């Protein structure tokens, strides 16, 4: 299966979540520090995690039905594999080149494109997960247009 790798934009990533970036409000002043809550969750308590990604292929995707999850690249290059909540076979792959937040229930996994990649993750403390295993590992390949 060949899946084209994309760079996330507000438009092409909207159905999976959002890109964490400044807004009109946070850019509204050249001299004052601005703060804006971009997303939240009804559940209590969040955890922050540091993920070192070394795998170059994915054996499965998982979802967190009741939790959003942020992926914030720190070092190296990795790819984010995602699929809609109700269509886990409809995979898309994005370069994780900016911080993003996944909606609740979006199927996902990450694989390294560089030798290893480091990612900061934030998600609900009591997160629950569901996993779907692929028949064969999915190994993204960069191709020319």
Model features per residue range: what roles?
Residues 1-94, 114-116, 122-136, 141-145:
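Non-catalytic, conserved peripheral segments adjacent to functional cores
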Residues 94-115:
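Conserved metal-binding segment of the jelly-roll/cupin
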